[in-house]
């Protein structure tokens, strides 16, 4: 094997070539993420940014004074509580609390009327959340009042006063602005990225009354503390104080104002804030396509077994994965670079460009690893792409749950284990930092803006990559797989492999035993004991030298649900060098399992095999250095050239770099592909691909070649060329060949082994097996006319044991036993005499004796290898069926279980509907409208049916029968197809369920308690001033006193500054207007100081103080300027001031006030009503879920067209309209299930946006219309696909993008005023997509509820809400369905090139009945001039004259000058596929249609079946023209296509029932007709199995049965036995023979590549070459006319032990005759046997003597034939490798040959020489054909003036004993020889 580095480079080059050969797809992978970015950039450029100059922010709207204006005073609060009947709560229920209420009640008497005291905070919360909260009568003194707010004390002195102000979520007062929510205490405490001013927190604090309560409580604390500085105010001293006037106002903060900080100049970018919530999703959608492609690549190579093929050739597992990782890492690096370059000036203008690149690149790496991990679960690319893409998208959903500031950091990190979630969280950081014009940089990635820092997001994506990689590698080893070794789950932690190897080695039997020991176990009950031909001494020597493959007791057992199944049972087999072993066996015999174990794809259960001395268990790496495999299915890349394939595999096999090019060129030349070396594989024919696979197996000088059905699918001529190639390369190699072709096995196999039930039943040469198992010869005689009675007594007189096997038409066949060989000569002479007399008598016209034995011709054929196979392997005809039952994948088994249950229960869908009385009128109106629409559609259907079907469908019951049958077909298939069920029901349901669940699980915790303190400011500071600087105006005396007691920061004195705001006069005027002429200028001065001193401290400032002078009543007033980056800054600095005032008032510096903001918990009613579900996200989830449904609509449609099942239905009589209408109805009904589930989920999750009052009807209408519109639009898209897997993936992506991305883009554009008008215009085009209409309608409903729609849109049916979507969807349902019918009439690739007139002509043709999809190329009359100048054969001309003259008008079928020409292109001219074809087919005739691939057979059948339209000429079926009346002739035709056109999920019985209905079998006879066919084709035991579980043979049986259902008079069979093993093939032949020749009622047209099949079935055969009919006639007629030789195979008697011993003794005597030997020879002899005086010719063993080259030459001279040994040195012709080569190779490798081996070779050569001399003298003109060391083959001249059969048998039989002939056989030229003759001359 090649080095790891070279293998890695080869894999990278392969990946690179695969990418570059698909430039569009690769470009899309790279650019689609960029396109999403460009769309955002385009929107971004339309959004204008606003530049805000520096501003003081002092105006009427921003200056707030507590208790004035919109901020309610405490008396106003109490009055409002009284008016609404609500209460203000206090806790705990202590004396201090009651005293406070008593004192405050003196000043505010209404307080006692609205006060409710609770024992403690817990009792308060329990009451608030209880079910009876707020439930009371309208009587004022109700027991369960609503609580609007509460004051809860935690400490009540003497030094610390700690309390919480708790407000209700619905706190709002009539007459004040509607504050939708109270302060958010769960949000970030500080947001340094906030730009400008954010007045919302200030308004919330002031409007809600929080500051009012804070002022009242703090004033009371200051007042009460002044009464007793040491003790808290008690009830005792309070009672005495009540008699005096209390100093209420002393140090009381009576005037409190709040003003925001000034702001510097900034640019407001609303774009980032708008797209922030959807940015992560949009980015992710851009990566979906490259992710789907990566999953597809990973699984495709596994699905197509390419990966295992690479492993077989020596590729290391880790290199395979690493190559794909590097490939996509480079691709994502390029993509990330492009994204960075495109966004550096727009989306990420302020961020570090390297950080942007790192962000996208790390996500790309994690996506690669996630895709790899996902791919390990799948073996089918189609399923993997669909589910993998969904999984990838689903990994984003936790983002909706954790994207909340209240979610803990730990939960966000855990969610970030899903890389899409980590990616989306990172996008939030980008949006926040970009909006702040700061940008993300390496210096600030530690600071979080979304609760999790950008650094953590990057780190998690990197960690995810490593985690996914580890999991993927582990799962790839342990998950079940179709090929390769599956590791145990704990292989990482155990020494499993070491123990396994040792255990297996201990069980391996000794390899020194004979190949087939005498005590070999034979299964009980087998009809035959194993039979093996003996081997030569040279072969035994190979076993001793380790130059062969030795399989010993190889055993493989599979575990299944039904128990263990033995696939290979103690296999014993040896393969030798320079030989080809053909391994035969029925399907499931164990051949493929054996090969899989030999190449290392499967581990053996027990036993072992040594390949060139290396164990397959312990030394597989060494074996693969010499191993070349040509698998059954080509492991080729269509996008690579021949050279690139050979180069890649040469590197894997270790070919040196210096010789790589020459090795590749030589191998291409050796396999006959030198002229195609730079051709892409997809442009190669099937035969060329097999040659390339063969070259791949041979390259690197592979010594062991395994060929698994190397010629499958080839025509006979290409097959012969491949056989010659395989013969050519077998020298010096060990070749194992498996095949179903007996001719191939016989032609190539030096030895043939037959397996059955996992064991080897026999092994030997072809002639050995034939004579051991053969039944003799087949004699075929052709009578002069059908009425002539052939004298069978001629045959029986000579051979009484002869049996008649068939008599059809003019031919009769006899089976002659082998024992009758001596009688053949006399019998043939009498037959030839009768032939001569028949010719003489035919000249006398008046003699008409029907009893005269007139024989026109005769032929003889020997027992075929196929008959041997049938005797050995065909004894148990059910073996294939048993294997089908046993070897079923787990997926299949589960499917079968489901099918069983489906058959027991019928589908009974129920339509449930409900409505309330209020909507009754609306529903009634809609129902009437719906009935009108149905009537209109029905009328339209009637019109279309008249146009398409020729008459009204209402009067045609057959139309409805077809619709019903097709509907049942779709229903059954869909219900059993787990993928369809998953796509249509499970995936949408699960996706919708979990998506809504994630949104519902989005945390909505109770608002937490926060302490209003400066401790959170500047956390890096330490010491007393931990809160940072507090700018303080000390110009007022009281200010200096208060400043001394300030804590929570250090005082920064106000200084004069020269800074002025822009427009200073305007700023001053605003300040005076807002705060008055005294305070206004002072506030402006403070703001100017804040601006000028911005950079004087590295610590942030969050508040500053301006104090008024002390008021006359002793009260104080002050103004707090607060920083907008902290939403709690205002009340925090109020608390700082009040605590300082308390200390000043009491003179106690240890006293303080601590205020907390802790909103009350939501009430039970509020919790039910508060579904803070993001409506827009809900619409996205619904749209994504429903995007999978149209993909499920497309799959069965494209798949039916792909396997030609659709065409099979159309030619069986189905009309286009019935096909599409039944499909449409089923798809709509199936759509109702996920739609109903969606409605149920809407109710379950309380989505009032969709099912609330007035919203249910539009939601249901949109769902139903969406089902109709999306189905019909999907039908239109299906015409653009030829592969269902590609259709599923692309259509899924189309609906993803058209429905989701367009909706998101439209949503974003609609929110931005600058793009709103453009959005309204674009929506008219976007709505052409049903997905957009549906998602936009749902989003509009949801956004209407959120108040985000236009104010003009009040009703749900408004045009801009759901009206447009409902109208568009309804129209699209009809429009797209009509387009579908139009596309059916005109293929998509021709729509653009067709003019209206041509389309109309095609429509007229369709009206006349050409109801299938036309695939006819448009060709002008100029093609009529294309012709070929070739004279017709005389038989062909006679047939043509007979048809043209009208003599065949009464026949069932005749073709008349049928011609088909395909148009050319700019590179190639027109191609004539069929040229003037003329012949007829009679009733009871089986016409064989033979020809090479591309000869025109399938095209001819396509024209007869209506799939193609002739260019010129026509054909007549029962006198009806196939061009003029295509529909009329279909009822007479049964068609079996070349490839099974089956529905994989329908059972065998259901297939037959479907086509019985289609073909018009009456209902009451369908069961009988179907049962008859099941019995006739031996399918009764499979009747309830779905077709995908059938073997290839049973599938072909079903296809033929479908063609014969309804007993059509004409049956067309296109290669009906392809892929069958001989047992199944013989059964099929018998069925077809009964149909045609035996019943005499049906005409059969048969195409085949098997000449044996044509010989067995066809009464007449026509051979097509180049589109023309070259010959026609019965099989025997063709063989008699074109056959010019006999095939002779002779095997001499084996060399006996006596002969061998005597010959060795002669040579020993001569060798030890020392005086006569030269000294050099004596030296060699001493070396060979050692020097010992005791050694004599009598005591020396022959096996101890090794002959050197000189000794061999001397011995040959002594024996008198020195020339014979010269063949040991020079090579023989390349086309044949004889015994000489093996000895020659051993002689030069080992320096000598053992004497017994040389003796055996010499004696064998003597026998061959004698035979050759006899044959050359007895049969002049005989030519040598081949020799395999065991037998020789000759071609003998035969025919006019040549040898007769009687002469041939007579010569051989008379000289048989004299020449020592063990076995011989003579046969005539085969049909294959004649076929190859015509093919070679084409």
UniProtKB/Swiss-Prot annotation:
Topology of this chain in the membrane:
Multi-pass membrane protein
Which UniProt keywords are present, listed alphabetically?
ATP-binding, Membrane, Nucleotide-binding, Repeat, Transmembrane, Transmembrane helix, Transport
Q: Which residues form the ABC transporter domain?
A: 549-782, 1453-1691
Of the GO CC terms on this record, one is: membrane
Binding residues annotated for ATP, in chain numbering: 585-592, 1491-1498
What subcellular locations does the record give?
A: Membrane
GO function terms (MF aspect): ABC-type transporter activity; ATP binding; ATP hydrolysis activity
User: Superkingdom of the source?
Assistant: Eukaryota
Q: Which CDD domains match?
A: ABC_subfamily_A
| Membrane-spanning segments | 23-43, 271-291, 319-339, 354-374, 383-403, 408-428, 454-474, 933-953, 981-1001, 1178-1198, 1225-1245, 1250-1270, 1290-1310, 1366-1386
Query: Does the record carry Chloroplast as a key word?
Result: no
Signal peptide as annotated in the record: none
Instruction: Please name the SMART domains in this protein's record.
Output: AAA (SM00382)
Family annotation (Pfam families): ABC2_membrane_3 (PF12698), ABC_tran (PF00005), R1_ABCA1 (PF23321)
User: Its principal location?
Assistant: membrane
Stated family: Belongs to the ABC transporter superfamily. ABCA family. CPR flippase (TC 3.A.1.211) subfamily.
Official protein name in the record: ABC transporter A family member 1
Q: Which organism is it from?
A: Arabidopsis thaliana (Mouse-ear cress)
- Taxonomic path: Eukaryota, Viridiplantae, Streptophyta, Embryophyta, Tracheophyta
Encoding gene per record: ABCA1
């Amino acid at each position: 094997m090649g080095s790891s580095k070279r293998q890695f480079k080869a894999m990278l080059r392969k990946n690179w070539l695969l990418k570059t050969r698909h430039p569009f797809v690769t470009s899309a992978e790279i650019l689609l993420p960029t396109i999403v970015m460009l769309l955002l950039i385009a929107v971004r450029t339309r959004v204008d940014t606003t530049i805000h100059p520096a501003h003081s922010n002092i105006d009427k709207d921003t200056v707030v004074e507590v208790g004035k204006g919109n901020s309610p005073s405490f008396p106003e609060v109490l009055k409002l509580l009284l008016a609404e009947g609500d209460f203000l709560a206090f806790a705990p229920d202590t004396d201090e609390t009651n005293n406070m209420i008593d004192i405050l009640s003196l000043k505010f008497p209404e307080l006692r009327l609205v006060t409710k005291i609770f024992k403690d905070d817990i009792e308060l919360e329990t009451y608030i959340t209880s079910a009876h909260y707020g439930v009371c009568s309208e009587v004022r003194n109700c027991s369960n009042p609503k609580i609007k707010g509460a004051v809860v004390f935690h400490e009540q002195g003497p030094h610390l006063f700690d309390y919480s102000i708790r407000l209700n979520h619905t706190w709002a007062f009539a007459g004040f602005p509607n504050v939708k929510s109270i302060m958010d205490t769960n949000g970030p405490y500080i947001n340094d990225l906030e730009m400008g001013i954010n007045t919302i927190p200030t308004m919330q604090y002031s409007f809600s009354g929080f500051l009012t309560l804070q002022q009242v409580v703090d004033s009371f604390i200051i007042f009460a503390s002044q009464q007793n500085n040491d003790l808290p105010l008690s009830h005792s001293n309070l009672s005495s104080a009540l008699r005096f006037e209390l100093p209420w106002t002393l140090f009381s903060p009576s005037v409190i104002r709040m003003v925001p900080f000034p702001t510097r100049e900034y640019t407001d970018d609303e774009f980032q804030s708008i797209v922030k919530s959807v940015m992560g999703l949009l980015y992710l959608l851009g990566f979906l396509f490259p992710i789907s492609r990566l999953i597809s690549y990973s699984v495709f190579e596994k699905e197509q077994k390419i990966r295992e093929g690479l492993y077989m050739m020596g590729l290391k597992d880790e290199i395979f994965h690493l190559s794909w990782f590097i490939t996509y890492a480079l691709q994502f690096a390029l993509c990330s670079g492009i994204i960075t370059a495109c966004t550096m000036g727009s989306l990420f203008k302020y961020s570090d460009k390297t950080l942007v690149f790192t962000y996208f690149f790390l996500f790309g790496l994690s996506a690669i690893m996630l895709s790899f991990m996902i791919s390990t679960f799948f073996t089918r690319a189609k399923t993997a792409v669909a589910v993998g893409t969904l999984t990838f998208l689903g990994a984003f959903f936790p983002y909706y749950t954790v994207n909340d500031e209240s979610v803990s950091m730990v939960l966000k990190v855990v969610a970030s284990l899903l890389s899409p979630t980590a990616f989306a969280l990172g996008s939030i950081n980008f949006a926040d930092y970009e909006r702040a014009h700061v940008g993300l940089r390496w210096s600030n990635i530690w600071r979080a803006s979304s609760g999790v820092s950008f650094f953590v997001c990057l780190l998690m994506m990197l960690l995810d990559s490593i985690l996914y990689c580890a999991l993927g590698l582990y799962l790839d080893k342990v998950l079940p797989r179709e090929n390769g070794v599956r590791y145990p789950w704990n292989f990482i932690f155990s020494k499993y492999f070491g123990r396994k190897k040792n255990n297996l080695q201990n069980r391996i039997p000794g390899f020194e035993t004979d190949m087939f020991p005498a005590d070999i176990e034979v299964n009980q009950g087998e009809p035959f004991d194993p039979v093996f031909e003996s081997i030569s001494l040279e072969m035994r020597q190979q076993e001793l030298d380790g130059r062969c493959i030795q399989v010993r007791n190889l055993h493989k057992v599979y575990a299944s649900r039904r128990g263990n199944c033995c696939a290979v049972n103690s296999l014993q087999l040896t393969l030798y060098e320079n030989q080809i072993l053909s391994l035969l066996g029925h399907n499931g015999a164990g051949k493929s399992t054996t090969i899989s174990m030999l190449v290392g794809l499967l581990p053996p259960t027990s036993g072992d095999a040594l390949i060139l001395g290396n164990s397959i268990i312990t030394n597989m790496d060494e074996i693969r250095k010499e191993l070349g495999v040509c698998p059954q299915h080509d492991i080729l890349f269509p996008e690579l050239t021949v050279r690139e394939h050979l180069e890649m595999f040469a590197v894997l096999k270790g070919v040196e770099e210096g010789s790589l090019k020459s090795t590749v060129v030589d191998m291409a030349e050796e396999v006959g592909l030198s002229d195609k070396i730079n051709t892409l594989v997809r442009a190669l024919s099937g035969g060329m691909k097999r040659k390339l696979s063969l070259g791949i197996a041979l390259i690197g000088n592979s010594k062991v070649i395994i060929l698994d059905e190397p010629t499958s699918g080839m025509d006979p001529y290409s097959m012969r060329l491949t056989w010659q190639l395989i013969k050519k390369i077998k020298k010096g190699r060990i070749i194992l060949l498996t095949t179903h072709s007996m001719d191939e096995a016989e032609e190539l196999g030096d030895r043939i082994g037959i397996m059955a039930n996992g064991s080897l039943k026999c092994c030997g040469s072809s002639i050995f097996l034939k004579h051991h198992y053969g039944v003799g010869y087949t004699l075929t005689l052709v009578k002069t006319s059908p009425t002539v009675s052939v004298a069978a007594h001629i045959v029986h007189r000579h051979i009484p044991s002869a049996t008649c096997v068939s008599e059809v038409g003019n031919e009769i066949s006899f089976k002659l036993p082998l024992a009758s060989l001596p009688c053949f000569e006399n019998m043939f002479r009498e037959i030839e005499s009768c032939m001569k007399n028949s010719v003489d008598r035919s000249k006398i016209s008046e003699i008409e004796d029907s009893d005269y034995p007139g024989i026109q011709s005769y032929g003889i054929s020997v027992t075929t290898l196929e008959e041997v196979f049938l005797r050995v392997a065909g004894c148990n005809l059910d073996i294939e069926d048993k294997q089908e039952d046993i070897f079923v994948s787990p997926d299949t088994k589960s499917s079968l279980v489901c099918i069983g249950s489906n058959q027991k229960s019928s589908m009974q869908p129920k339509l449930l509907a409900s409505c309330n009385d209020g909507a009754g009128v609306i529903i009634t109106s809609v129902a009437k409208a719906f009935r009108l629409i149905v009537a209109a559609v029905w009328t339209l259907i009637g019109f279309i049916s008249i146009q398409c079907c020729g008459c009204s469908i209402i009067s045609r019951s057959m139309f409805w029968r077809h619709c019903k049958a097709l509907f049942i077909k779709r229903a059954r298939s869909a219900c059993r197809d787990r993928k369809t069920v998953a796509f249509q029901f499970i995936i949408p349901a699960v996706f919708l369920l979990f998506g809504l669940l994630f949104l519902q699980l989005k945390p909505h915790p109770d608002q937490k308690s926060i302490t209003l303190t400066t401790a959170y400011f500047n956390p890096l500071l330490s010491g007393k001033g931990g809160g940072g600087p507090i700018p303080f105006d000390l110009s007022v005396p009281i200010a200096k006193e208060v400043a001394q007691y300030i804590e929570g920061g250090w005082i920064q004195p106000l200084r004069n500054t020269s800074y002025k705001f822009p427009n200073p006069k305007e700023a001053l005027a605003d300040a005076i207007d807002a705060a008055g002429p005294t305070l206004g200028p002072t506030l402006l001065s403070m703001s100017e100081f804040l601006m000028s001193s911005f950079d004087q401290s590295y610590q942030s400032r969050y508040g500053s103080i301006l104090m008024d002078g002390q008021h006359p009543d002793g009260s104080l007033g002050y103004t707090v300027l607060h920083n907008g980056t902290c939403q709690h800054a205002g009340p925090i600095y109020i608390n700082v001031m009040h605590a300082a005032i308390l200390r000043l008032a009491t003179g106690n510096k240890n006293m303080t006030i601590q205020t907390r903001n802790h909103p009350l918990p939501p009430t039970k009613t509020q919790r039910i009503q508060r579904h803070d579900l993001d409506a827009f996200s809900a619409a996205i989830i619904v749209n994504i879920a429903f995007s999978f449904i149209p993909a499920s609509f497309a799959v069965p449609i494209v798949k039916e067209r792909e396997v030609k099942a659709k065409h099979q239905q159309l030619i069986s009589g189905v009309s286009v309209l019935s096909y599409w209408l039944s499909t449409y109805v089923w798809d709509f009904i199936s759509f109702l299930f996920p739609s109903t589930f969606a409605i149920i989920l809407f109710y379950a999750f309380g989505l009032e946006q969709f099912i609330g009052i007035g919203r249910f009807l539009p939601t249901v209408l949109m769902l139903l219309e969406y089902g109709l519109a999306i189905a019909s639009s999907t039908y239109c898209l299906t015409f653009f696909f030829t592969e269902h897997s590609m259709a599923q993936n692309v259509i899924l992506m189309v609906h993803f993008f058209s429905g989701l991305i367009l909706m998101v883009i439209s949503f974003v554009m609609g929110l931005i005023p600058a793009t709103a008008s453009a959005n309204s215009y674009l929506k008219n085009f976007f709505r052409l997509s049903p997905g957009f209409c549906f998602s936009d309608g749902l989003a509009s409903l949801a956004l209407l509820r959120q108040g985000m729609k236009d104010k003009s849109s009040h009703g749900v049916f408004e045009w801009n809400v759901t009206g447009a979507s409902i109208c568009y969807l309804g129209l699209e349902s009809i429009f797209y369905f009509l387009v579908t019918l139009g596309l059916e009439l005109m293929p998509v690739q021709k729509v653009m090139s067709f003019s209206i007139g041509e389309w109309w002509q095609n429509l007229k043709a369709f009206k006349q009945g050409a109801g299938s999809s036309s695939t006819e190329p448009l060709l002008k009359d100029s093609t009529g001039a294309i012709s070929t100048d070739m004279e017709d054969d005389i038989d062909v001309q006679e047939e043509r004259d007979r048809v043209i003259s009208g003599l065949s008008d009464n026949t069932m079928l005749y073709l008349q000058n049928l011609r088909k020409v395909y148009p050319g292109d700019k590179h190639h001219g027109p191609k004539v596929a069929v040229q003037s074809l003329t012949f007829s087919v009679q009733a009871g005739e089986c016409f064989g249609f033979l020809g090479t691939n591309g000869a025109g057979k399938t095209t001819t059948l396509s024209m007869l079946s209506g799939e193609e339209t002739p260019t010129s000429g026509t054909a007549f079926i029962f006198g009806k023209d196939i061009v003029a009346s295509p529909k009329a002739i279909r009822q007479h035709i049964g068609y079996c296509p070349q490839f099974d056109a089956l529905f994989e999920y329908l059972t065998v019985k259901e297939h037959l029932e479907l086509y019985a209905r289609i073909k018009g079998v009456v209902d009451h006879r369908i069961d009988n007709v179907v049962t008859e066919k099941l019995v006739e084709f031996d399918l009764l035991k499979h009747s309830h199995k779905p077709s995908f579980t059938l073997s290839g043979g049973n599938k072909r049986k079903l296809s033929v049965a479908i063609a014969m259902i309804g007993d059509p008079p004409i049956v067309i069979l296109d290669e009906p036995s392809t892929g069958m093993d001989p047992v199944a093939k013989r059964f099929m032949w018998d069925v077809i023979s009964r149909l045609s020749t035996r019943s005499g009622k049906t005409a059969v047209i048969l195409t085949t590549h098997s000449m044996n099949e044509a010989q067995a079935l066809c009464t007449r055969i026509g051979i097509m070459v180049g589109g023309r009919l070259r010959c026609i006639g019965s099989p025997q007629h063709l063989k008699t006319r074109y056959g010019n030789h006999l095939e002779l195979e002779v095997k001499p008697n084996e060399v006996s032990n006596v002969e061998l011993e005597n010959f060795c003794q002669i040579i020993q005597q001569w060798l030890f005759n020392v005086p006569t030997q030269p000294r050099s020879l004596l030296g060699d002899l001493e070396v060979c046997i050692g020097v010992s005086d005791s050694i004599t010719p009598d005591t020396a063993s022959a096996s101890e003597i090794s002959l050197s080259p000189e000794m061999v030459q001397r011995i040959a001279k002594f024996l008198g034939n020195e020339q014979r040994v010269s063949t040991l040195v020079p090579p023989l012709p390349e086309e044949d490798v004889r015994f000489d080569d093996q000895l020659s190779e051993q002689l030069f490798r080992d320096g000598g040959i053992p004497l017994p081996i040389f003796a055996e070779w010499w004696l064998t050569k003597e026998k061959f020489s004698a035979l050759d001399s006899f044959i050359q003298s007895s049969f002049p003109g005989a030519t040598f054909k081949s020799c395999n060391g065991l037998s020789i083959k000759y071609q003998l001249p035969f025919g006019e003036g040549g040898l007769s059969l009687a002469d041939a048998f007579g010569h051989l039989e008379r000289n048989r004993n004299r020449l020592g002939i063990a076995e011989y056989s003579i046969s005539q030229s085969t049909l294959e020889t004649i076929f190859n003759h015509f093919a070679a001359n084409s």
